[in-house]
Swiss-Prot record:
Pfam families named in the record: HH_signal, Hint
Subcellular location(s) per record: Nucleus; Cytoplasm
Annotated site residues (Essential for auto-cleavage) in this chain: H329
Organism: Drosophila grimshawi
Keyword Signal in annotation: yes
Main location class: nucleus
Site positions for Involved in auto-cleavage: T326
Signal peptide start and end residues: 1-19
Official protein name in the record: Protein hedgehog
GO biological process, one term: system development
Family the UniProt entry places it in: Belongs to the hedgehog family.
PANTHER family listed in its UniProt record: HEDGEHOG, PROTEIN HEDGEHOG
């Protein structure tokens, strides 16, 4: 809870107390008046003073109210949240500075046809193509279409493209009241865009603002990134180019967020251990709510599959650290202007952003390092350990244990039952005996038995991923 909210609640409490006090004094005044009237008719006896009775009758009600108010304040103050971030959490959403793109900049800084961006071409769609029925028209009063052909082709696009365009139109009207989004090109059936183009599949749009103010285009590109377009390019001073993944692309679902098995975590002993060999109960280097390095216990694996091929984002820092992680995974990003930490999807991290990296020169503290390069690679195997802190330091880079949902605090709250279950299990003496007996009976390390126990998504994580589409707004999900 922030200071303004606490101050407001205490102000309300003070005002309530004042009103109750005034009410009591008014009641006392009425009692005095009645007492004087009665004293003129009958003499005052030595029985209990009516003012004391009134005060006694009033006090429990005021005490009860104050008790309830204090309980409310305690409940609000004890909700889980990171003191330095993230940008989106359970409480009031923090305003985030949005920086316009510069001319020729693309987000992400990958080839448009890579899996980490809009993905490969799937083939030209014309009116006779079977896939033409998958294109949908967009009619929205907040969006203007140039439609030079006069055929309505510019209104045709994939469902995903339509979805992102509607979100962008709302952002444009909020950013510049009275200005609308202008679509100059969408699906192209006349092949005006060269040999290869996502315009031919209805997966790309060329946009501008209705007032044609070129000074707005850098911010327009940034708003397109925030709206969820998979690849945005400030390609020209006259317009912005945006594209999306195919509706049939398996990469859209992002059912998990993981690291590679060969990536390493640091144990409490100081040794480095590959994530593919981690076991439940290992204590690994993590990050607490204040951004400090701490050791935290691994309580489960949300996903673990050593054979699955996956596309990863690689972040290279100026200190030599390299983090390989799936696009939907949350990464801690340091905001030097606001001196705060945000949790950002890996494929939204850009060059010149800052991530937290373990600095051996300062005794293992987490220090910001600049991202020099962002790339996309294919690797075999995925591992997603969950620590009690909800964070983990992998290859010396601090990251979240969560993915898909943009709110670190909400994701951490959602896994609270698993943390509680892990705590209850640790209290069972039989479990410790069982573990010790297994260690004595088997000469193989504990990690091998763990590897055999789980292959794939954890049932609880899988349930949360399925529910998210029904309970969370789309802007909070990695789509």
């Amino acid at each position: 809870m922030d200071n303004e909210a606490v101050s407001a609640l205490w102000s309300c409490a003070s005002a309530t107390c004042l009103s109750l006090d005034v009410k009591r004094h008014c009641s006392d005044a009425n009692v005095d008046s009645q007492a004087r009237t009665q004293s003129q008719a009958t003499p005052m006896t030595n029985e209990t003073d009516p003012r004391k009775l009134r005060h006694i009758a009033h006090t429990p009600r005021g005490s009860c109210f104050m008790t309830l108010l204090l309980l409310l304040l305690l409940a609000l103050n004890f909700r889980h949240a990171h003191s330095c971030g993230p940008g989106r959490g359970l409480g009031r959403r923090r305003d985030r500075n949005l920086y316009p793109l510069v001319l020729k900049q693309t987000v992400p800084n990958l080839s448009e046809y890579q899996s980490g961006a809009s993905g490969p071409l799937e083939g030209v769609i014309d009116r006779k193509s079977p896939k033409f029925k998958d294109l949908v028209p967009l009619y929205n009063s907040d969006i203007l279409f140039r439609d030079e052909e006069g055929t309505g082709a510019d209104r045709m696009m994939t469902k995903r493209c339509k979805e992102k365009l509607v979100m962008l139109a709302t952002s444009v009207m909020n950013e510049w009241p009275g200005v609308k989004l202008l679509v100059t090109e969408s699906w192209d059936e006349d092949h005006h865009h060269g040999e290869q183009s996502l315009h031919y599949e209805g997966r790309a749009v060329t946009i501008a603002t209705s007032d044609r103010d070129q000074s707005k285009y850098g911010m327009l590109a940034r708003l397109a990134v925030e709206a969820g377009f998979d690849w945005v390019s400030y390609v020209s001073r006259r317009h912005i180019y945006c594209s999306v993944k195919s509706d049939s692309s398996s990469s859209i679902s992002h059912v998990h967020g993981c690291f590679t098995p060969e990536s390493t975590a640091q144990l409490e002993s100081g040794a480095k251990k590959p994530l593919g060999e981690l076991a439940i109960g290992d204590r690994v280097l993590s990050m607490d709510a204040k951004g400090q390095a701490v050791y935290s216990e691994v309580i489960l694996f949300m996903d673990r599959n050593l054979e699955q091929m996956e596309t990863f984002v690689q972040l290279h820092t100026d200190g030599g650290a390299v983090l390989t992680v799936t696009p939907a995974h949350l990464i801690t990003v340091w905001q030097p202007e606001r001196q705060t930490l945000d949790f950002v999807f890996a494929d939204h991290v850009e060059e010149l952003n800052y991530v937290l990296v373990v600095d051996d020169a300062t005794g293992g503290e987490l220090r910001p390092q600049r991202v020099l390069r962002v790339s996309s690679v294919r690797r075999r195997g995925v591992v997603a350990p969950l620590t009690r802190e909800g964070t983990i330091v992998v290859n010396s880079v601090a990251a979240s244990c969560y993915a898909v949902i943009s709110s670190q605090s909400l994701a951490h709250w959602g896994l609270a039952p698993m943390r509680l279950w892990s705590t209850l299990q640790s209290w069972l003496p039989a479990k410790d005996k069982l573990r010790s007996s297994k260690v004595q009976e088997k000469s193989t390390p504990k990690v091998n038995s763990t590897a055999q126990l789980q292959n794939g998504l954890h049932w609880y994580a899988n349930a949360l991923y399925k529910v998210k589409d029904y309970v969370l707004p789309q802007s909070w999900r990695h789509d």
